[in-house]
């Protein structure tokens, strides 16, 4: 149980090459969450900031459907805070991933009013993640220089993540 508040900003722009068929997309997501365990004795607070940049190629179909497909790079960072954890009450989360980006757009006209429908899919494929060992303190990582194994490789075999967005 809990709640999450977030805001997203996205900017699309046609690139100067490719006869208007290539677009670039900048997306920034910021959110904060506060969650509690079902028994009420666990509590987790998190904040995250994500930025992604992608380039997408545009296909236009005679029926009015527009399909954009391409790749993107995403940078993420944030903090998890667990008040019950005495060793590391706050944990940093960072990642960088490369993936696919898809977008389907269709505009429905009701009278004079256009109603655009858009579905977006982001599917990370390869990435690197900051992931300390369980129970490893930041004192051990940064002061004692125990850096081995804190950056992990990620792909579909150990971190499947798919972001979907539907807008009307």
Q: Which stretches of residues belong to each language-model region?
A:
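Short glycine/proline- and aromatic-enriched beta-strand/turn motifs that initiate or cap beta-hairpins
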Residues: 1-27, 33-35
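Extracellular loop and loop/strand-boundary signature of outer-membrane beta-barrel proteins
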Residues: 1, 34-43, 85-91, 151-156
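Short loop/turn motifs that connect adjacent beta-strands in outer-membrane beta-barrel proteins
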Residues: 14-24, 58-67, 109-117
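Residues that define the transmembrane beta-barrel architecture of outer-membrane proteins
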Residues: 3-7, 22, 43-51, 65, ...
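Membrane-embedded beta-strand positions of outer-membrane beta-barrel proteins
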Residues: 24-28, 69-73, 117-121
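Transmembrane beta-strands of outer-membrane beta-barrel pores
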Residues: 30-36, 73-81, 121-129
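Residues on the lipid-exposed face of transmembrane beta-strands in outer-membrane beta-barrel proteins
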Residues: 7-17, 49-57, 100-108, 119, ...
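Outer-membrane beta-barrel transmembrane domain signature
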Residues: 87-167
């Amino acid at each position: 149980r809990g709640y999450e508040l977030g805001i997203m900003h996205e900017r699309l722009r046609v690139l100067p090459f490719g006869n208007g068929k290539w677009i670039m997309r900048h997306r920034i997501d910021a959110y904060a969450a506060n969650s509690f365990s079902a028994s009420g004795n666990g509590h987790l607070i998190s904040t995250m900031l994500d930025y992604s940049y992608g380039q997408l190629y545009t296909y236009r179909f005679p029926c009015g459907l527009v399909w954009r497909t391409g790749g993107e790079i995403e940078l993420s960072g944030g903090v998890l805070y667990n008040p019950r954890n005495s060793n590391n009450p706050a944990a940093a989360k960072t990642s960088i991933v490369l993936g696919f980006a898809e977008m389907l757009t269709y505009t429905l006209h009701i009278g004079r009013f256009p109603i655009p429908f858009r579905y977006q899919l982001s599917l990370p494929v390869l990435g690197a993640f900051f992931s300390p060992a369980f129970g490893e303190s930041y004192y051990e990582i940064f002061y004692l220089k125990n850096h081995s194994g804190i950056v992990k490789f990620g792909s579909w075999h150990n971190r499947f993540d798919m972001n979907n967005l539907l807008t009307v």
